[in-house]
Curated annotation (Swiss-Prot):
Gene Ontology biological process terms, A to Z: pyrroloquinoline quinone biosynthetic process
Name of the featured protein: Coenzyme PQQ synthesis protein B
The keyword Glycoprotein is annotated on this UniProt entry: no
Organism of origin: Pseudomonas entomophila (strain L48)
Record-linked HAMAP family: PQQ_syn_PqqB
């Protein structure tokens, strides 16, 4: 299984266009040793030619341009994208679909709840129906697993995560299973397994068991501290309120990952305020000391 990190930042990217926090300002001033990052998205393949896009960020055009296999040039109009899987209906995971309209029809896999959001509060399916067949919905059931024809050796097992629907959603304050998903992806030839959960607010025993059976854990790296947004003066909500488990402290993501010494562990969906973006910070050093990697745009993994 080929795993390509197209984008590794949380919503807004890094540096965020309107932010002058210590990280964003330091990057622009050249006083911070860090890499710019686009908004979170990955691509998966079983042969390096046919790719499944997981989430479509607003930065999708630049992400595809930076990864040559996404333009195989086999025809006058071509793409390496063969299907799209949406883990939720968040704006920073779906607006990239608008930029992909010239390539319609696209096979899009998502849950009933995500499809409902994307036909009501943010009606992308309706809007893009006017472009050559638009978005073709394939339902993700919350039980069992599924295979996408373009990559027949990859088996996807979805699992619901506890988190809210987007602010625009008609059921924002009425959460349902299927609003947010993680994925366990297995290459049935190699046996390699990826646990992918870029929005992980709570880890229960069932998830711990799934993580223990995976070879690579690609998980939520949004915040270092739960109250980081408040500390930095850029927001009022905590990580838990937004559905993100912070890395630091008792019960934090690093402590969770300490329990998996065998697995490759990678943090993704990193907010612009997170000090681990600073490659010289003590927080980054602590992450490295504990055997955890920080995802970057263009990172390639293979299982």
């Amino acid at each position: 299984m080929y795993i390509q990190i197209l984008g590794s930042a949380a919503g807004g990217g890094f540096p965020q266009w309107n932010c002058n926090c210590v990280n964003c300002k330091g990057y622009r001033d050249g006083t911070l040793r860090a890499s710019a990052r686009t908004q979170s998205s990955i691509a998966l393949s079983d042969d390096g030619e046919h790719w499944i896009l997981c989430n479509a960020s607003p930065d999708i055009r630049a992400q595809l341009q930076a990864f040559a296999p996404m333009q195989p040039a086999r025809a006058l109009r071509d793409t390496g994208i063969n299907a799209i899987v949406l883990l939720d209906s968040q704006i920073d995971h779906t607006t990239g679909l608008l930029s992909l309209r010239e390539g319609c029809p696209h096979q899009v896999w998502c849950t009933d709840m995500v499809h409902q959001d994307l036909t009501t509060g943010f009606p992308l399916f309706n809007m893009l129906s006017h472009w050559n067949g638009g978005l073709v919905w394939n339902r993700i059931e919350l039980e069992g697993s599924f295979v996408i024809e373009a990559c027949p050796n990859l088996r996807f097992t979805p699992f619901p995560l506890r988190s809210a629907a987007p602010p625009y959603s008609p059921h924002r304050f009425d959460p349902h299973p299927g609003d947010n998903l993680g994925l366990l992806v297995e290459d049935t030839r190699t046996g390699g397994k990826l646990f992918y959960a870029p929005g992980l607010g709570q880890v229960d025993d069932k998830l711990l068991q799934m993580m223990g059976g995976a070879d690579c854990l690609l998980v939520d790296g949004t915040l270092w501290e739960d109250d980081e947004m408040q500390r930095r003066g850029v927001g009022t909500r905590t990580g838990r309120e937004m559905g993100h488990l912070a890395q630091n402290g008792p019960g934090g993501m690093l402590e969770v990952l300490d329990g998996f010494p065998r697995q490759r562990k990678v943090l993704i969906h990193i907010n612009n305020t997170n000090p681990i973006l600073d490659e010289d910070s003590p927080e980054r050093a602590e992450v490295v000391r504990r055997g955890v990697e920080v995802a970057f745009d263009g990172m390639s993994l293979k299982l």
